[in-house]
């Protein structure tokens, strides 16, 4: 057998749970890259990870590199022999260096001449002699932001390392990893399992589970936790809220998962469920349980890392731990209810938003005015928008949000309802921050959209206005996210808003705060750049985006319509020919000095092909005008695609730059007219 399975395990102290998957995946990727570089064939490779170990398993790994022939080229034949045909010193030196005589060399003929060459056979190195060094290099390249040292060793890693095991089949690979000598001993679960001697790479998972009480396969452990949590929730008539991020973290915290169900006092359900869920998931790593109507139940599911003889004791312990946190939430909620959001407005004057842009009170005053302005343009209730904007940051001054920061906006919504604010105002309190992350939904309620846009635009214009635009990866005010949010809200709700108008209004509301005279232009450019990034993420071809960007449409909903239209046009059979023709037209018109002619004189249409093109354009223009007016760009481009034959024939038969000045100008006017029809939508000459 010319191959064996390889197992490498690193036994450590508890690894950071949020980094565990990335560490394991990177270890595997780095090691397989090493195998490829070393020309070592293998069938497949997988990673394993648990809180106190990283491991990789490579199946059917070649036991040695394949032998290979290495071509060693010597001097040119013309300089390898003298006039009498005897080898020169250069030829003899080269031959001696390769352990041969000159007459043993072969000859290689190329287009640059004839050369001496020696095809040396290089025997492959045994795999076992390469593994330790490759594994160490793979570990050295792991993404570890803050490595640490332990004991007296100078070795650094993310956590202290206690064991290293490298087995190729049943053979122990000699060597060290991070200063630890490779050995067969594998540690088990800290409390339940026992350590053992690993006899063969193939037995790693089985022995670790049976003797060590560790499920090393991360994905299996994750699936087990999810399935058991769902079953546990179903037993009490509910559904577990299992977000993947939390499931990943819990999976990374346990080696032997045991899913248990606990409860808390029903009185806590009087507190908004978001606050309870926040502390259960964020602080305790518990899975909340909801009924079929989406109402929080007084239960939670947690995952223990031990199989106890008395699970009731573990359940009681977790209930005891979570109770004070829920009691805190209850206390904060009851205390906050004693004061309205409006009464908290003066306290916003004590919180600085940004040194040059004023306090949070200044910010909400601007948001209120800008939200009302936006609402007037979109048909939303401007009074509600102004009110929601004014109150938008008041929940930041509540005890609940100060303690549970991720509940900002959500608690504002609950407090607004308790204060008797309109539902539109209350909903806007929560939705003002949307979208919070890539893939998050955008607000859809009209007032919410106005407030969310106002908040983001105020920040964008303000920060650019004081000359603190994002540089490189640094973006302390999350302006890129704010910009994408502005575009998505307008596009996905098809709002009739113009960026230039919005930016100008936001700048006006900042008054004399802004020192950057170019702020409005810079914000617009920034938003246009975000358009490109957003559409690229959606899979839109770059040339389609550039074709639309060339027209600088500043209404995002209109921009989106053009993108969709050009994407559709690109799929039409005529698109490539018309794109090429537009490029040709663009080049011709670019060479014209002075103002381009625009009037077509039918009497000067001498050739049949130019008559046909002019007639086709004249036929289409009355149909195109209403389509352009209604932004039905897709239908407009579909109609324009019918020009292909006429355009092709024109360039086949007509000399545009005729000697006759009148004929030339008439043809230029025809081409200018043709190009202008396409430019109503995009510059399709940029399509590849």
Curated annotation (Swiss-Prot):
Query: Which coarse location class applies to the principal site listed for this UniProt protein?
Result: cytoplasm
Please provide the record's keywords in A-Z order. Answer: Aminoacyl-tRNA synthetase, ATP-binding, Cytoplasm, Ligase, Nucleotide-binding, Protein biosynthesis
SMART domains associated with the record: DALR_1
Q: Which reaction does it catalyse?
A: tRNA(Gly) + glycine + ATP = glycyl-tRNA(Gly) + AMP + diphosphate
Annotated signal sequence is: none
Q: Sorted alphabetically, which InterPro entries does this protein's record hold?
A: DALR_anticod-bd (IPR008909), Gly-tRNA-synth_bsu (IPR015944), Gly-tRNA-synth_heterodimer (IPR006194)
Q: Name one GO biological process term.
A: arginyl-tRNA aminoacylation
Q: What class of enzyme is it?
A: ligase
What does UniProt give as GO cellular component? cytosol
One GO MF annotation is:
glycine-tRNA ligase activity
Q: Is Magnesium included in the keywords of this UniProt record?
A: no
Q: Does the keyword Magnesium apply?
A: no
Compartment(s) where it occurs, according to its Swiss-Prot or TrEMBL record: Cytoplasm
Give the E.C. number(s): 6.1.1.14
Q: How does it assemble?
A: Tetramer of two alpha and two beta subunits.
Provide the family line.
Belongs to the class-II aminoacyl-tRNA synthetase family.
State what protein this is by name.
Glycine--tRNA ligase beta subunit
The record lists the organism as Shewanella sp. (strain ANA-3)
